[in-house]
Amino acid sequence: MEYTTELLAHGTKVCINKTHRFGTDAFLLSHFAGVKYRQAALDIGSGCGIIPLRWYDFGHRGNAVALEIDAEGTWLTNESIKLNGAENITAVNADIRDWKTDIQFDVVTCNPPYFTRGKPKDDEKKASFRHQFTLTDFDVAKAAFRLLKDNGKLCVCQRPSRLATVIYAMKQNRIEPKVIRFVKQRTHDDVPWLVLVDGRKNGGASLTVMPDLIVENVNGGFSDEILSIYGKNINKE
């Protein structure tokens, strides 16, 4: 199988192809999750494994599972694991609704697809496993509750128009939304293009809305915060 590699900030190689690649949202979610050095972490719908590989690149050495329903994505993740010697990462080819494990995770992440209605176009057929009709926000929250430790966190990113659905799905599965952060491309943009949500299993009812995260500075380059996110190491606690 053909692939190319992308190099992360600290030298980790990520194998990608036309179907399984990554964007800014994966970078933001991997940082937002705040995974600590030895915590157990699961990424649902991991694609090429970018989120666990970013954690590895920034120093995470706890148990990390990259779960992907498409075998091609799992294969790419395994290639990246071998290239980097990232032995703490396990690539799993499975449907999260059926997958069982004895591990209780500290953190679960999910970077879901953003189209939710209608049939995928012909050129999207290969990516149909990423389509929202195969995995709903409720499915993710239900699986996260089953797999998280008490007070463990589920972190997701979604389009802002889906925020109400994400919150409802979390609450229906006893995951309490604790932190919300909107992402704007530029300071003067009226509408954010992404929202990050952190929910805690059996958490208390309090919610913090963080200041907007701005991607670009006034000159069109990355903002200072984005540059910090791209280069920030995991705290070894």
Walk through the language-model features, giving the residues of each:
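Mobile active-site "lid"/loop adjacent to the S-adenosyl-L-methionine
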Residues: P112-D139, A143
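Conserved SAM-binding loop
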Residues: T77-N78
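Conserved class I S-adenosyl-L-methionine
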Residues: R38-G45
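Conserved Class I SAM-dependent methyltransferase catalytic core
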Residues: T19-F22, T136-P192
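A short acidic, Gly/Pro-enriched loop at the edge of an enzyme's catalytic core
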Residues: K100-V108
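Conserved SAM-binding loop of SAM-dependent methyltransferases across substrates and taxa
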Residues: C48-R61
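SAM/dcSAM-binding transferase cores
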Residues: H188-E237
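Conserved SAM-binding motif I beta-strand of class I
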Residues: N63-E68
